[in-house]
Amino acid sequence: MKSLLNIEEHPLEPFLPANAKLLMLGSFPPQKKRWSMEFFYPNLQNDMWRIFGIIFFQNKEHFLNPDKKVFDKERIIDLLNKKGIALYDTASAVRRLQDNASDKFLEVVEQTDISLLLKQIPMCKAIVTTGQKATDIIREQIKVKEPVVGTSEPFEFEDRTMRLYRMPSSSRAYPLPIEKKSAIYRIMFNAVSYTHLTRPTK
């Protein structure tokens, strides 16, 4: 029997605005020593909030504090509430096989119940995954074809017709410039019926 001592429980509660029409799911947060705030995507080396800054404010540093060392959690939450974007992860408990945040070295001990999340956000019509492990876990729970990165596939959940979007990882380990990642995310946000998001002017 494997030791229970190394099991990490998810440190955050699901972020589920009542008006959420989009649920973004990663795999699991990085180790606390890599956090710059108590929220999702807390690592300064992860570009998720820079991607959001480019798309919604034409400024990749929009969600950084003036010292550039911390993300501004309150500004992030304000945007997510206004836009109806929910966040959580596909693993609720993991064991780290190495001392890093790579999905490759995460052993999932307990999966998140995706259907339970969706039942709490009845207006949600799309799920976004940002990595292979998250995509695999969703496909174990929901009957849906695996999307190619940058595309989506339809699926049914109860009385809802939904889509699963597979986005490129916001990790800098994923070899794609942030501008190209932002362009792919922008297409997804527009497809989920957000106000039309144009490319920033140069």
What would you call each of these model-derived segments?
Residues T195-P200:
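Conserved small/polar residues in nucleotide/adenosyl-binding loops
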Residues E110, K181-F189:
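Binuclear metal-dependent hydrolase catalytic cores centered on His/Asp/Glu-rich metal-binding motifs
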Residues V148-P154:
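An amphipathic alpha-helical core segment
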Residues A191-S193:
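Acidic, proline/serine/threonine- and glycine-rich low-complexity intrinsically disordered segments
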Residues Q58, T201-K202:
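A very general structural signal that marks isolated residues within well-ordered alpha-helical segments
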Residues K2-A126, Q132-P147, E158-P175:
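A polyanion-binding, active-site-adjacent surface
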